[in-house]
């Protein structure tokens, strides 16, 4: 996915969020915090993942630092997330907005968290990768080993109970 295509996906998400906030004022602060205050998809993703996966052991701010470190080192993860958003938007008839996976779909969240764990695993930070895998499993009921290999443009529909082992590939 080119930078231009990534910008198109992000601009669609922000436009949808503005419309959604106008249509449902009770959720306006939610849309602002999760999407509208962020400059790019990576920032929104890091905010969302950090808040979903935080725990007393690892607060959201610490998780967000790790996610942002990974995105800075490998921006292709953000492009992969945009491809995943497009895949969900194209393949799932129940999804009519680009913002839906980012806001609500735990399969999408689990997949993006896996990408961070996979990066950590490949950096030799295996303890943190396994910790993150466990948080994903507890939070989303999705268990993807950080050593697994997963491509882009992936949709994990509903996602509950999905298990991908360390020697598996999903393309």
Segments (PLM) and residue ranges:
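Terminal amphipathic alpha-helical/low-complexity segments used for targeting or macromolecular assembly
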Residues: 1-135
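Conserved small/polar residues in nucleotide/adenosyl-binding loops
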Residues: 168-171
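A mid-sequence, solvent-exposed acidic-amphipathic segment
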Residues: 133-165
């Amino acid at each position: 996915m080119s930078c231009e295509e990534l910008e198109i996906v992000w601009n669609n998400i922000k436009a949808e969020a503005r419309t959604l906030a106008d249509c449902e004022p009770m959720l306006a602060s939610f849309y602002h915090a999760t999407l509208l205050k962020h400059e790019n998809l990576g920032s929104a993703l890091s905010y969302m993942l950090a808040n979903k996966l935080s725990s007393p052991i690892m607060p959201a701010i610490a998780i967000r630092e790790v996610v942002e470190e990974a995105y800075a080192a490998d921006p292709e993860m953000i492009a992969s997330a945009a491809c995943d958003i497009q895949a969900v938007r194209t393949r799932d008839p129940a999804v009519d907005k680009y913002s839906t996976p980012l806001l609500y779909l735990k399969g999408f969240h689990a997949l993006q968290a896996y990408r961070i764990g996979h990066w950590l695993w490949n950096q030799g930070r295996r303890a943190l990768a396994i910790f993150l895998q466990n948080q994903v499993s507890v939070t989303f009921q999705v268990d993807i080993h950080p050593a697994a290999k997963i491509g882009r443009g992936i949709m994990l529909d509903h996602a509950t109970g999905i298990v991908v082992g360390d020697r598996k590939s999903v393309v």
